[in-house]
Amino acid sequence: VDIVDNTGHWVGRGFYNGHSRIALRVLTEDYEEALDEAWFVRKVREAVGLRRDVLRLDETTDAWRVIHSEGDGISGLVVDRYGDLIVVEFFSAGAFRHREWIYAALREAFPGCRFYSFAEEHVQKQESFDFRSPEPPAPSVITENGLKFRASPGSGHKTGFFADQRDNREYLSRFTQGARVLDICCNSGGFAIYAKARGGADEVIGIDLDEEILEIAGKNAYLNNAKVKFVQSDLFPYLRDAA
C-alpha cells in the first residue's frame, strides 16, 4: 500500500496487514520505487553483496545469515544459508505472500540450492496466514574456518548450529593451546571442537543436559577428528561434584 500522512502527503510504501499487531511495514520511501519482483531481486542482491563483497564471509564459512529482516530492508523475512541449504523463515504475511519472488531471487544468488521454509505457528496466527512446513531436509555439513559441522534445520534444536558465534569460537581457540577446557551448555559442541581441533587444547569436556544434542556434538567432533568428551548432565550438580 501507499502511505500518506494526515495532510495527504505521500511518505512511503509497504506491507499492510489489518490483522497484525504490526499493521504497517515500511519498505521504501522512494515514490518511484515499485514493490515488484525486481525490487525483491535487488534487495537480495544487495544483502548477498554485503556478505560476499564487503564482509567476505565466503572466505571463512558457507554458513551465514543472508537476509536479516528490517536490517536488509525486507521486513518479516529471515534467510540463513547452511552450505547448499537455504532456510527461509517468514515473520509477516507480506513476505509470505511474495515468497515465489523471494525464492527466485535466492536461486539466482545460490544456484542449485535446496530450500527449507517455515513460519512459527504463533506468527501465522498473529499475521493471519497459513503455511504447513515441509518435512525437515537432510542435514547439511557446513565449513567454518576449516572445521566442519552438521546443521539440521527443522529438527527439535533449531539448526543445531549457531552461526552467529563464529567469531567468538575462533577467538576462544587462540587461548586454548595445551589447556584444559570445560564447555558448559555445549550444545552441538562448537566451542569445544574449536578449542581442541583449532586451538590445540590438551583436554576438552563438553556438558549439556540434552542427550540428543550431544549426539550431534559427537558427530561434529568425529567430522573434525577432535577428541572431545561429552557428558550428559545438569551443569549444577556436575560442577559441585567436580569442585
Residue ranges and their predicted role:
Residues 38-58, 111-127, 173-199, 209:
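A short, charged
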Residues 85-90:
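Carbohydrate-binding surface patches
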Residues 47, 105-109, 220:
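Conserved short hydrophobic interaction patches
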Residues 134-243:
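Rossmann-like S-adenosyl-L-methionine
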Residues 67-80, 96-162, 170:
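Non-catalytic substrate-recognition/targeting regions of SAM-dependent transferases
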Residues 1-83, 137:
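Non-catalytic accessory regions of SAM-dependent methyltransferases
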Residues 36-43, 94, 98-102:
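Short amphipathic alpha-helical segments
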